[in-house]
Amino acid sequence: RDAQESRGLGDVYKRQELDHPRFAEFDLSTLRTGIMAGSPCPIEIMKRVVSEMNLSQITIAYGMTETSPVSCQSSTDTPLDKRVATVGTVQPHLEVKIVDPESGECVPVGQSGELCTRGYSVMHGYWGDEAKTREAIDAEQWMHTGDLAVMDAQGYVNIVGRMKDMVIRGGENIYPREIEEFLYRHPKVQDVQVVGVPDRKYGEELCAWIIARPGATLDEDEIRTFCQGQIAHYKIPRHIVFTDAFPMTVTGKIQKFKIRDEMKQRLGLEEEKTA
């Protein structure tokens, strides 16, 4: 029977399909649409899903369990460049704003900040945990997602990372997802995760864990050479590790904190204590 839809739970599952050794044997000519959701999907993976899986009308959705779950989504007629690089626009009857995490004020268009959403889909609260509810939902009923996002002049939202994952190196704010998106463009890189690790000189340094494509040979010098002249010098990972897999939850979400903890152990690093 012909299938026309593909529903995926984020980039992990779609990458497994795209890189399956028998992928070329399957006829996907009847596929046309689907939904990508569950975890951030790199631009390069979205492009491959469109071109290699024939999903010309695929959409992407963003949200969280606490928002029932979708707050933003693209549509089948959203321009392709917006569908692969953003999570679309706010859903009908909901509100979204991007705020400065410190002041709580809305940031200008094109500037990053914390994504907040409000509307009928937002939960009433965490069962039996009023303190946690107050941390997440403010007095005006805005749900603070903890995600860093940018909204353009047309209302398209781009998720640039998690607030807790942002790396501050020598006073420079670095979003790991930006580095991941860049490294995905390397033809030998199958998957990559970037985290911050403690550093005595700069406070934090970047660390990249990389899974190479099957049969490919990669080393640190090749990765650094690929980065030079293409991204700012302080965004080039100081530590590069090649691995076969990332630590994940049972639902397929990558556990960056475990990568960070393992690197701290390997390198004998600890965060500097502050007053």
Locate the predicted segments by residue:
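Gly/Ser/Thr-rich phosphate-binding loop
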Residues: L18-K82, E95
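Adenylate-forming AMP-binding core of the ANL superfamily, especially NRPS adenylation
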Residues: P40, S74, L80-G128, A136, ...
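Core-facing hydrophobic residues within beta-strands of well-ordered domains
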Residues: L31, L55, Q91-H93, V189, ...
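Single conserved hydrophobic/aromatic residue that forms the stacking wall/gate
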Residues: R1-Y13
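Beta-strand->loop->alpha-helix junctions that form or flank phosphate-binding loops
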Residues: I58-E66, T86-V90, V195-V197, V241
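Acidic/polar alpha-helix N-cap and adjacent early helical turns
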Residues: D261-A275
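Active-site glycine-centered loops adjacent to acidic/histidine catalytic or metal-binding residues
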Residues: G38, G63, G88, D147, ...
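AMP-binding/adenylate-forming catalytic core of the ANL superfamily
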Residues: I43, G119, H124-G128, K132-E135, ...
